[in-house]
A protein has these predicted regions:
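Conserved Rossmann-like nucleotide-binding pocket used by diverse enzymes
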Residues: 17, 94, 153
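Catalytic domains of cell-wall/extracellular-matrix polysaccharide-remodeling enzymes
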Residues: 55, 101-210, 215-232
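Sparse, context-dependent recognition of short Cys/His-centered cofactor- or disulfide-binding micro-motifs
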Residues: 6, 25-29, 88, 163, ...
Length: 244
């Protein structure tokens, strides 16, 4: 009887091991294929601004998100540390003229000086680089555009955050209208814009969106940005730089 029990035990051991193996395999979760990632660029105009710009940088750092900041030259001097922080944390920095000048009006030499003065400030502070230009209000005289040696950027999704001044409304504008490849226009002087941007990031990440700088967005879309060209999106160029 003992011999039979021993035989049964020896037969049972491999069977139990086989069952355990089967149970372990059954517990493995099958991961379905994920949809392709969608890329968008958050861009912020009219900074740097005391308080709100630092708050925005804190929120972006917590989320490991990179954005693009178009800076007004006359505001840089009082916030050089903030501008350095932008660069150190991997954000792209661009030119928004020295005084937020309408580049479709006034003297041609003055228009060009507005761009060159801010470019010189950024170069002195951060070193040589290609500081893309966003013309204030998107206006640019053809004569001036021909003198610009860097890419120029408009936007494809205008949140109108400067007018709404309501975080819920601004966030909803983004969530309802965003699509892959968008360039989103916001303004970091407004606390409501900062709140809306961070909330939109949290929501859209769950929908497969990634937030990148303009340079990375163009690279991801396989577009080589051309100097003096005004882009609405990587795949869309503004037909006439002077259009208003």
């Amino acid at each position: 009887m003992r011999r039979y029990r021993s035989v049964l035990f020896l037969l049972a051991v491999p069977l139990l091991a086989l069952l355990a193996c089967r149970q372990e395999k059954a517990a493995v979760t099958t991961i379905s294929a994920q949809p392709p990632e969608k890329y968008v660029a958050l861009t912020f105009d009219d900074g740097p601004w005391p308080g709100t710009t630092e708050c925005l940088l804190d929120g972006l750092a917590e989320r490991d998100v990179k954005a693009t900041f178009f800076l007004i030259g006359e505001q840089i001097g009082a916030m050089e540390d903030t501008v350095r922080r932008m660069a150190e944390e991997g954000h792209q920095i661009g030119n928004h003229t020295y005084t937020h000048m309408d580049l479709s009006r006034g003297d041609a030499a003055e228009r060009l000086h507005e761009v060159e003065e801010t470019d010189a400030l950024l170069t002195e502070l951060l070193g040589e680089g290609t500081y893309w230009l966003r013309p204030p209000w998107g206006f640019m005289a053809e004569e001036t555009a021909r003198e610009i040696s860097v890419p120029m950027v408009y936007w494809s999704l205008d949140t109108e955050d400067w007018r709404r001044l309501d975080a819920d409304e601004v966030e909803r504008e983004i969530l309802d209208n965003v699509r892959d490849g968008d360039i989103i226009l916001m303004h970091d002087p407004y606390a409501t814009s900062v709140e809306a941007a961070l909330r939109a990031i949290d929501e859209l990440r769950g929908q497969g969106y990634r937030f990148v700088t303009l340079e990375e967005l163009f690279a991801r879309k396989g577009v080589e940005p051309r100097p003096g060209t005004l882009y609405i999106r990587p795949d869309e160029v503004k037909s006439s730089s002077a259009d208003q």
